[in-house]
Amino acid sequence: TKSQQPAAVVNSIDLNASYSSVKWRSIGPLRGGRSVTASGVVGDISTYYMGTTGGGVWKTDDMGNTWRNISDGYFTTGSVGAIAVSESEPNTVYVGMGEHAVRGVMTHHGDGVYKSTDAGKTWKKLGLEQTQHISRIVIHPRDPNIVYVAAQGALYGKTPERGVYKSVDGGTTWKKVLYVDDKSGCVELSMDYNNPQVLYAAMNEYGRLPWKVISGGSGSGLYKSNDAGATWEKIQNGLPKELGKMAVAVSRSNSEKVYALVESDSDKEQGGLFVSENAGKNWTRVNDDHR
């Protein structure tokens, strides 16, 4: 019989060569300062929202060719920390105020959460004014009324208004579902969109003093909930003992795979990119660059 021919081998693409002629260019907007948050719209490749640290929320409908401010006249401060667009109802947009990237020079703190149900044409304030700096907003993929807010809290002092807040009525009322102490806020929140009952929250003891920036302490840690925020378990097997700011993301294609970018004691070189292959039970460092 005729021997079977081997399958064709697809040559790998040299991405550097493919994009060597592409040049970066600014697409604006030219007012507002730094940006620490942006969000697209599922199913719409042309529409994006961007939050700036001094100029409020901006929107593009044409892939970034033009931008327009959509928060002027509604917001009482221009410092935006988080934007989230509902996957099941794209006209529903939540915005958390107060930039979350702690640095030597910070803009004004935020004043809570705003919501739009008409894709940014109008806005309503939903409370949580004392959280001051919001780092992430997560919306249930099938119910826009279930929403979680990661609140870092005040930068310059101790306050209890920090942690993870949850609403089941579209932001009309809020319940604090994760709290560590009055110095530690939630810097990152990630949901398993294949099972929205599962959440990961990164808590960080942080603050700003006249002579230094604080990031990391006894209140820092990575937490997981399997019951939509009702209870939480601290997970740390394989992670550095000393934790600072963290970023966390659950793989959409595999809920068992979770990534964590961890700041740790830089002198000991313990930080970096960690991955879990069993939904947070164990962690392995795969890269020592934590930038």
Task: Report the location of each language-model feature.
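Beta-propeller blade termini and top-face loops
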Residues: 2-291
